[in-house]
Amino acid sequence: MKKLWGGRFKKTAEEWVDEFGASIPFDQELVEEDIEGSIAHATMLGKCGILPSEDVEKIKAGLFTLLEKAKQGKLEFSVAYEDIHLNIEKMLIDEIGPVGGKLHTGRSRNDQVATDMHLYLRKRVTEIIALIQELQKVLVEKAEEHVETIVPGYTHLQRAQPISFAHHLLAYFWMLERDRERFRESLKRINKSPLGAGALAGTTFPIDRHLTAELLGFDGIYENSIDAVSDRDFIIEFLSNSSMLMMHLSRFCEELILWSSQEFQFIEIDDAFATGSSIMPQKKNPDMAELIRGKTGRVYGNLLALLTVMKGTPLAYNKDMQEDKEGMFDTVKTVTGSLKIFAGMIKTMKVNVDVMEKATKQDFSNATELADYLANKGVPFREAHEIVGKLVLICIEKGVFLADLPLDVYKEASPLFEEDIYEALKPYTAVNRRNSAGGTGFSEVRKALEKAKKIVNTP
């Protein structure tokens, strides 16, 4: 089959070579963006007097027809035409005749594909920002229900100090807020137009790059034509931001998996987000949480792959850069799917309040309260730490907890201990006293919730 660029060649490639080099199996994802960019380009060609108005109207009418078919999923693509750009150009020529071949005036596939990807990511990143905000709303709603639910806080996966469960949930809220900020910031760089940069050096036609940028809703243009067609930073930044977001979801998934186990029993994941075993009738597996955790590695891989592709490419465009798309598409699908699943999982999970609170009474996570108690009475903290460490050892040897020790044992360790030590040891008291800014005290958690609510209710 004759290539649209085949004039310089004496023979055509073998079919299997065409298949190896073709990107249409995956870049057809850009079909709507490609047509939208072409409509703006055609409009500009007319306004600048580069093409006659009657040609422009025919071209635009044909493109709008193709766009409608694309939205209905009625376009059929061919590997023979390599990529989305040549497929659309061939369809346009078939639709309106040879005048369709004038569309590519003053344009290269290099600036065309870059424009497509900017348009694509602008749309997808905006969707991801909204999905993050929806998940944040779910976290706030769940946190509001559990301000005074006490749960062990962990370091090294060992019980450390009792905390408000809402405080734990809000830790993820703020991680997600940073993610949302990063994606919002990235839109400044995504929303620049490379259209009109040509292959790399611009064009001799009197085009208006600012006009096409305006028509496509871009904030401005790339200032250097070589940079415009060479840049894939905006995709790498998207993949990097996505990797951090997925890392945060993965960490939370790890906790959900642990908490839903019989060893913890802190939560129960809703049946809609779990599966069973083909051999063990009793099993309820947290598969969706495990899948999100696993898919995080997939997103990391997409980031590393594109960094590796780009590290050795000289300016300007190289065919290597065709490898920028599959990882981008895959990451968009993975991130959007993970956010939707995760929000549903958190919204429907059952929190076993009694189990959580019972756990805080069967450990030594209140030991810091004893050290603080002595420090407040003038004992140097390191000395207080030593005293409490010995009391913990006594408990371990006796098989009891700190609240079980009689007052005379405390007084033997330090005469500064009084009867009020037992109130300080209560998990509820221990949590509520930690009212430093950003702490787990109930008043601080309620303040944090108010801030979080304002954030999620701001567009």
UniProtKB/Swiss-Prot annotation:
Q: What is its EC number?
A: 4.3.2.1
Q: What class of enzyme is it?
A: lyase
Tell me the SUPFAM superfamilies matching this sequence: L-aspartase-like
The Swiss-Prot or TrEMBL record annotates one GO molecular function as: argininosuccinate lyase activity
Q: List the CDD domains.
A: Argininosuccinate_lyase
**Keyword Amino-acid biosynthesis on this protein?**
yes
- InterPro entries recorded for this chain? Arg_succ_lyase_C, Argininosuccinate_lyase, Fumarase/histidase_N, Fumarate_lyase_CS, Fumarate_lyase_fam, Fumarate_lyase_N, L-Aspartase-like
Quote the cellular component terms of the Gene Ontology held in the record.
Answer: cytosol
Q: In which pathway does it act?
A: Amino-acid biosynthesis; L-arginine biosynthesis; L-arginine from L-ornithine and carbamoyl phosphate: step 3/3
| Cystine pairings recorded for this chain | none
What keywords appear on the UniProt entry?
Amino-acid biosynthesis, Arginine biosynthesis, Cytoplasm, Lyase
In which compartments does the protein localize?
A: Cytoplasm
Query: Tell me, which GO biological process terms does this entry list?
Result: arginine biosynthetic process via ornithine; L-arginine biosynthetic process
* Catalyzed reactions: 2-(N(omega)-L-arginino)succinate = fumarate + L-arginine
One short Pfam family name for this protein?
Answer: ASL_C2
Q: What does the sequence similarity comment in the record state about its family?
A: Belongs to the lyase 1 family. Argininosuccinate lyase subfamily.
- NCBIfam families in alphabetical order: argH
- Could you identify this protein by its name? Argininosuccinate lyase
Its taxonomic path starts at: Bacteria, Bacillati, Bacillota, Bacilli, Bacillales
Task: Supply the gene name.
Answer: argH
